[in-house]
């Protein structure tokens, strides 16, 4: 039976069904348990990073090689014809589509991945981040990590802490978890960085429970997942940043009343919003989360490039 992800563009989380998300999570678990080095043998994947990336690019390229594919591409968009000779993104994509079986693309411009998908001649485009818009494969590894640690994706209490206004990871993960049953969200942020209205309106329309908070200490005892994010210094003046930052620092002491199954996640890099003493607690899972990016991306690539997987 053909899987619904075969040759599908992976541009945004809302375009993926619950069944597709579950298939990716299940396949990631299988590949973590039993590696398969020939899943995309003889397939060539373009890794096109028009802005700097460390974890995402290395994770994708590792995933491609571990399941038997070959990688071509670049990690510095400034040295491409697009930048140096004025070539349009659409022209670049049309040319590269002649060489490869799939695109992985990160670009600073919102909507760039969708534009690429319109000019790729049917070659599937996987969005590795387009500006502040979407980062769907981060969400896939987050879902896999939550499933791995909680043994479920339904019936969860999940808190997001920090920059909820600009953080594309929290927007995408909220949209993904909203497809599951009995999810209760806790959004913890200063008013200036609160979750955007469009996300809250979607939750209201779907009848999904959420609450807004400015203090995380009071919600920690209720949580299964605590998802921390960095408060971005560049968005505040010095005194305002110092005040906001100090309110959203997770320490080991704050976790003393947490549920035994609570896991702390973070898309990384962290600055000082999680103190290093948290690393030694059984709740810390952000480094394993980053490692899971390889398996989630292996699963996605395998499904996009195999008709009957």
UniProtKB/Swiss-Prot annotation:
Pathway info: Pyrimidine metabolism; UMP biosynthesis via de novo pathway; (S)-dihydroorotate from bicarbonate: step 2/3
One term under GO cellular component: cytosol
Keywords, sorted A to Z: Pyrimidine biosynthesis, Transferase
Top class in the EC scheme: transferase
One biological process term in Gene Ontology: 'de novo' UMP biosynthetic process
Catalytic activity: carbamoyl phosphate + L-aspartate = N-carbamoyl-L-aspartate + phosphate + H(+)
Matches recorded under Pfam families: OTCace, OTCace_N
Residues at which L-aspartate binds: 85, 168, 230
InterPro entries recorded: Asp/Orn_carbamoyltranf_P-bd, Asp/Orn_carbamoylTrfase, Asp/Orn_carbamoylTrfase_sf, Asp_carbamoyltransf, Asp_carbamoyltransf_Asp/Orn-bd
Entry keyword Signal: no
Documented EC number(s): 2.1.3.2
Entry GO MF terms: amino acid binding; aspartate carbamoyltransferase activity
Residues binding carbamoyl phosphate, per UniProt: 55-56, 106, 135, 138, 268-269
Similarity remark: Belongs to the aspartate/ornithine carbamoyltransferase superfamily. ATCase family.
Subunit comment: Heterododecamer (2C3:3R2) of six catalytic PyrB chains organized as two trimers (C3), and six regulatory PyrI chains organized as three dimers (R2).
HAMAP family: Asp_carb_tr
PANTHER family, per database record: ASPARTATE CARBAMOYLTRANSFERASE, ORNITHINE CARBAMOYLTRANSFERASE, MITOCHONDRIAL
Biological function: Catalyzes the condensation of carbamoyl phosphate and aspartate to form carbamoyl aspartate and inorganic phosphate, the committed step in the de novo pyrimidine nucleotide biosynthesis pathway.
Protein name: Aspartate carbamoyltransferase catalytic subunit
Species of provenance: Vibrio vulnificus (strain YJ016)
């Amino acid at each position: 039976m053909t899987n619904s992800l075969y040759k599908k563009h992976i541009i945004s989380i809302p375009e993926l069904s619950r069944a597709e998300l579950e298939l990716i999570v299940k396949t990631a678990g299988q590949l973590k348990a039993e590696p398969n080095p020939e899943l995309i043998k003889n397939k060539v994947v373009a890794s096109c990073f028009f802005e700097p990336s460390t974890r995402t690019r290395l994770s994708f390229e590792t995933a491609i090689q571990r399941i038997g594919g070959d990688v071509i591409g670049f990690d510095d968009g400034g040295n491409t014809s697009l930048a140096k000779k004025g070539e349009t993104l659409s022209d670049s994509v049309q040319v590269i589509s002649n060489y490869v079986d799939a695109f992985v693309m990160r670009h600073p411009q919102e909507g760039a991945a969708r534009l690429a998908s319109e000019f790729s001649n049917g070659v599937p485009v996987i969005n590795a981040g387009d500006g502040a818009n979407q980062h769907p494969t981060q969400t896939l590894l987050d879902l896999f990590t939550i499933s791995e640690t909680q043994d479920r994706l339904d019936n969860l209490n999940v808190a997001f802490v920090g920059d909820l206004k600009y953080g594309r990871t929290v927007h995408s993960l909220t949209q993904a978890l909203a497809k599951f049953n009995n999810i209760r969200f806790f959004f913890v942020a200063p008013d200036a960085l609160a979750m955007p209205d469009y996300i809250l309106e979607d939750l209201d329309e779907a009848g999904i429970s959420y609450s807004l908070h400015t203090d995380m200490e009071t919600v920690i005892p209720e949580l299964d997942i605590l998802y921390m994010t960095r408060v971005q210094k560049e968005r505040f003046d010095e005194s305002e940043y110092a005040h906001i930052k100090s309110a959203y620092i997770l320490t080991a002491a704050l976790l003393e009343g947490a549920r035994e199954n609570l896991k702390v996640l973070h898309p990384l890099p962290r600055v000082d919003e999680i103190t290093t003493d948290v690393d030694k607690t059984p709740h810390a899972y952000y480094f394993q989360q980053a490692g899971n990016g390889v398996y989630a991306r292996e699963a996605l690539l395998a499904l996009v490039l195999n008709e009957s997987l």
